[in-house]
């Protein structure tokens, strides 16, 4: 049931957004990431949380959503992983993107790291 809630939440938040190159509705990207997580991490004890995080991974960066709304709707584990995947634009300006990515990857939880790798495929 939480998965359906996440799909609806993501669709509402990304409504009207499209992928830059393809022009497809933006929700195709997080939906594919959630599918790939299911394919490659199907045996994970936190599969549902990983897939929900995949669905929500860009809602803070690209919509009016904040971490508190994610936590209220989906819990602290999912909120924490979404935050790990959310870029801090101010920090990127401060230290540069290569250094930011290096610091982010080193401090990321294994679940967020897996999600990051999958959505970069």
Segments predicted by a language model, with ranges:
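Active-site helical microenvironments for divalent-metal-assisted chemistry
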Residues: 1-121
């Amino acid at each position: 049931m939480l998965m359906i809630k996440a799909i609806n939440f993501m669709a509402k938040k990304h409504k009207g957004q499209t992928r830059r190159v393809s022009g497809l509705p933006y929700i195709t990207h997080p939906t594919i990431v959630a599918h790939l997580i299911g394919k490659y991490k199907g045996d994970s004890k936190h599969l549902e949380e990983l897939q929900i995080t995949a669905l929500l991974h860009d809602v803070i960066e690209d919509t009016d959503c904040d971490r508190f709304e994610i936590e209220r709707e989906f819990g602290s584990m999912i909120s924490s992983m979404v935050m790990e995947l959310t870029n801090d634009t101010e920090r990127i300006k401060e230290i540069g993107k290569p250094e930011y990515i290096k610091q982010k990857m080193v401090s990321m939880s294994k679940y967020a790291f897996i999600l990051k790798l999958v959505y970069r495929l």
